[in-house]
Amino acid sequence: MNIIALPAFSDNYIWLLHDGRRALVVDPGDAQPVLKALQSTGLDLEAILVTHHHPDHTAGVSELREATGATVWGPAREAIPEPFIPLHDGDTVTALGVAWSVLDVPGHTAGHIAFWASDIDGAPLLFCGDTLFSVSYTHLRAHETVLDL
C-alpha cells in the first residue's frame, strides 16, 4: 500500500492511498490536488473516506464523486455531501481490500469519526481527521479512544 500526502490550502493534507491501480482518499477538502494526482498516476479512485463535516475536509467530495464515481463514506451524525454511506462507531468499511474500523471520536465536531486499520503492510494506520489538532477544542474521550489503539 502506498500513501501520498497531497498538500491542500495553506496547512492541510489530503491523504491518497493506492495499490498501484486503485486509490482512496481521506478528507478531500479540495478536488484539484486529487484529480491531478489521479491523472498523473493513472489511478482509479474507488473510495472517499470523510472524518467530519468541515469544508476543509469535504469541499472536494462532490466534484470527486462526480468525476470518478467513487463511493463516499462518512459520519452518520454530520452533514456530508450527499449521497454518502453513513457510518457509526463499530462499523467496518472495506476499501482497497483493507478492513477499516470506524471509531467514534467526538470533540473537534460532535459526530467526528476516525478510520483504523490494524495491519497495512505490517503496521497499523489511523486517519483521525482533526481529532489530534493542536489549535482546536478537543474532547478527552476522543483522545482516550485513540490512545487505546
Name each region found by the language model:
Residues 9-10, 23, 28-104, 118-119, ...:
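Active-site HxH/HxHxD metal-binding segment of metal-dependent hydrolases
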